[in-house]
Amino acid sequence: MSLVRGHGDIAATTAAPLSEEGEVTSGLQALAVEDTGGPSASADQAEEEGEGGREEAEHEGSGAEEVQGEAPSPEGEERAKGESEDWCVPCSDEEVELPADGQSWMPPPSEIQRLYELLAAHGTLELQAEILPRRPPTPEAQSEEERSDEEPEAKEEEEEKPHMPTEFDFDDEPTTPKDSLIDRRRTPGSSARSQKREARLDKVLSDMKRHKKLEEQILRTGRDLFSLDSEDASPASPPLRSSGSLFPRQRKY
């Protein structure tokens, strides 16, 4: 018993302090060795207990170092506090416009007394401010109902306008040609722009028929209708020389 206890004391002094569970297990192992009864077995058991205690102590030491590494250092705590305290509040306009003495503007007591007396006497104070001119109001946009009311009126006006005939308005009905010999001479005193000329299909057709009739007359008689009229008016005038063209001279209509 003494030897076992002696070896157990040596192992306890060389190894790191064990936990409570480790002590219980080591005690049970010592009792088991005592029952078997052998000095060599007890010595081996003591050595094994010493090695196990060393391993447990090393493991506990490494865990403590990891915990210490994870814990924030005092310098890091001071920096975090400094960053949290580094804040500012923007100044108001009154603080920016403070005079050199650092006191805000206040009217003199005499002015305050005068204003209170005016309020007591009249009840209101006149506003002393420059009134700027205002621009005219923006016209309101027309609603859809007003637009719909204006559209039928515009359509009615377009329908009421008379149709102006053009040369491309074809009419299949036969029309009587107008007199081909129209006197274009204007009377003195009348303006040259008294009548507006309009292109009409019936006028174009009448001109075509008139030219065709003149060509047939020239081919049949060899003379123009205008030359016959001039010969009847003045028989003593010399005859015109015939040329190879269909229209020997320029005609005026």
From Swiss-Prot:
Q: What is its main location?
A: nucleus
Q: Which UniProt keywords apply?
A: DNA damage, DNA recombination, DNA repair, Nucleus, Phosphoprotein, Transcription, Transcription regulation
What are the record's GO terms for cellular component? MLL3/4 complex
User: Does the keyword Manganese feature in the UniProt annotation?
Assistant: no
Xref: InterPro entries: PA1 (IPR028213)
Q: Which domain of life is it from?
A: Eukaryota
Region listing for Disordered, in residue ranges: 1-109, 128-253
Where Phosphothreonine occurs, the residues are 138
Here the disulfide bonds are: none
Query: What are this entry's molecular-function GO terms?
Result: nuclear estrogen receptor binding
Query: Could you tell me the Gene Ontology terms of the biological process aspect for this record?
Result: DNA recombination; DNA repair; positive regulation of cell cycle G1/S phase transition; positive regulation of intracellular estrogen receptor signaling pathway
Q: Where is the composition biased (Basic and acidic residues)?
A: 51-62, 195-223
State the residue spans of region: Sufficient for interaction with NCOA1. Answer: 116-160
Q: Which residues carry this modification: Phosphoserine?
A: 143, 148, 237
Per the record, which residues fall in region Sufficient for interaction with ESR1?
Answer: 161-253
Where does this one sit in the cell? Nucleus
- Return the Acidic residues bias intervals: 142-159
What residue stretch is flagged as signal peptide?
none
- Chain's role: Its association with the histone methyltransferase MLL2/MLL3 complex is suggesting a role in epigenetic transcriptional activation. However, in association with PAXIP1/PTIP is proposed to function at least in part independently of the MLL2/MLL3 complex. Proposed to be recruited by PAXIP1 to sites of DNA damage where the PAGR1:PAXIP1 complex is required for cell survival in response to DNA damage independently of the MLL2/MLL3 complex. However, its function in DNA damage has been questioned.
Oligomeric state and partners? Component of the KMT2 family MLL2/MLL3 complex, at least composed of the histone methyltransferases KMT2D and/or KMT2C, the common complex subunits ASH2L, RBBP5, WDR5 and DPY30, and the complex type-specific subunits PAXIP1/PTIP, PAGR1, NCOA6 and KDM6A; PAXIP1 is required for the association with the MLL2/MLL3 complex. Forms a constitutive complex with PAXIP1/PTIP independently of the MLL2/MLL3 complex. Interacts with NCOA1, ESR1, NR3C1, AR.
Which PANTHER family does the UniProt entry name for this protein? PAXIP1-ASSOCIATED GLUTAMATE-RICH PROTEIN 1 (PTHR28467:SF1)
- What is the protein name for this chain? PAXIP1-associated glutamate-rich protein 1
Q: Which organism is it from?
A: Bos taurus (Bovine)
Gene name, please?
PAGR1
